[in-house]
Amino acid sequence: MNMSVLTLQEYEFEKQFNENEAIQWMQENWKKSFLFSALYAAFIFGGRHLMNKRAKFELRKPLVLWSLTLAVFSIFGALRTGAYMLYILMTKGLKQSVCDQSFYNGPVSKFWAYAFVLSKAPELGDTIFIILRKQKLIFLHWYHHITVLLYSWYSYKDMVAGGGWFMTMNYGVHAVMYSYYALRAAGFRVSRKFAMFITLSQITQMLMGCVINYLVFNWMQHDNDQCYSHFQNIFWSSLMYLSYLLLFCHFFFEAYIGKVKKATKAE
């Protein structure tokens, strides 16, 4: 492949972004993610209690706008971080793409890495619509939101290896997922296979997360300076991704395979 095709061009706002200030801010403030998570949990239980006594809100137009905004953000994030990761993969190889800390402070990706971790706080707003519209709130939904927020803020401050893969995969899956949510909220009929594809993509993402953690753990044993992380981070990350993998597999079975079996028996 012609490497000139993969040459990265920065936009002005990406060039002007000061990653040192961003990393310093996160080092000083990452524990606020626990406060956000606590307020989020309080809203879930308090909101559900309050909504038991009143009719649901429709909120179709705000939901379309919300989902579309996150879809556009995720699409741009996926394109920019994806271009950077592809460039590193093609020019320096897999190990460098996993271990290199330049994803946090390099051209193009530095802005989108910080935007990613910050976005995990407003993304908690997804649940507001579920509560106010009195839809079913499953454990996977709020567990995933809380743990991603906590882990991303905790990891960004240390610029740990593997972050580029984690963030790029998440951007990509969210680009598809929020586009699907926007279409559904707007009243479009979307094939059930599309929803299945999204869940399978999430399962693949979690499986890849486990693989990346294994690679980081293996490579850091030989050269921690070139593949920087620490055991505590890998432990929490592995536990998180493994729990996601099991929960998404269970969700896939219950939502798609289990329903098909029940429908077949009913016939």
UniProtKB/Swiss-Prot annotation:
GO terms classed as biological process: fatty acid elongation; fatty acid elongation, monounsaturated fatty acid; fatty acid elongation, polyunsaturated fatty acid; fatty acid elongation, saturated fatty acid; long-chain fatty acid biosynthetic process; long-chain fatty-acyl-CoA biosynthetic process; positive regulation of cold-induced thermogenesis; sphingolipid biosynthetic process
Carbohydrate attachment residues: 2
Parts of the chain that traverse the membrane: 34-51, 70-90, 111-131, 136-156, 159-179, 197-217, 234-254
Gene Ontology CC terms, in alphabetical order: endoplasmic reticulum; endoplasmic reticulum membrane; fatty acid elongase complex
Known regulation of activity: The reaction is stimulated by the presence of HSD17B12, the enzyme catalyzing the second step of the elongation cycle.
The protein's enzyme class: transferase
Reaction(s) catalysed (UniProt annotation): a very-long-chain acyl-CoA + malonyl-CoA + H(+) = a very-long-chain 3-oxoacyl-CoA + CO2 + CoA; hexadecanoyl-CoA + malonyl-CoA + H(+) = 3-oxooctadecanoyl-CoA + CO2 + CoA; (9Z)-hexadecenoyl-CoA + malonyl-CoA + H(+) = 3-oxo-(11Z)-octadecenoyl-CoA + CO2 + CoA; dodecanoyl-CoA + malonyl-CoA + H(+) = 3-oxotetradecanoyl-CoA + CO2 + CoA
Family per record: Belongs to the ELO family. ELOVL6 subfamily.
Enzyme Commission number(s): 2.3.1.199
InterPro entries associated with the record: ELO_CS, ELO_fam, ELOVL6
Post-translational modification: N-Glycosylated.
Domain of life of the source: Eukaryota
Primary location group: endoplasmic reticulum
GO MF annotation terms: acyltransferase activity, transferring groups other than amino-acyl groups; fatty acid elongase activity
Keywords tagged on the record: Endoplasmic reticulum, Fatty acid biosynthesis, Fatty acid metabolism, Glycoprotein, Lipid biosynthesis, Lipid metabolism, Membrane, Transferase, Transmembrane, Transmembrane helix
One matching Pfam family: ELO
Record's subcellular location: Endoplasmic reticulum membrane
Membrane topology classification: Multi-pass membrane protein
Pathway of action: Lipid metabolism; fatty acid biosynthesis
Summary of the function given for this chain in its UniProt record: Catalyzes the first and rate-limiting reaction of the four reactions that constitute the long-chain fatty acids elongation cycle. This endoplasmic reticulum-bound enzymatic process allows the addition of 2 carbons to the chain of long- and very long-chain fatty acids (VLCFAs) per cycle. Condensing enzyme that elongates fatty acids with 12, 14 and 16 carbons with higher activity toward C16:0 acyl-CoAs. Catalyzes the synthesis of unsaturated C16 long chain fatty acids and, to a lesser extent, C18:0 and those with low desaturation degree.
Tissue note: Expressed in liver and barely in brain.
Source taxonomy: Eukaryota, Metazoa, Chordata, Craniata, Vertebrata
Protein name as catalogued: Very long chain fatty acid elongase 6
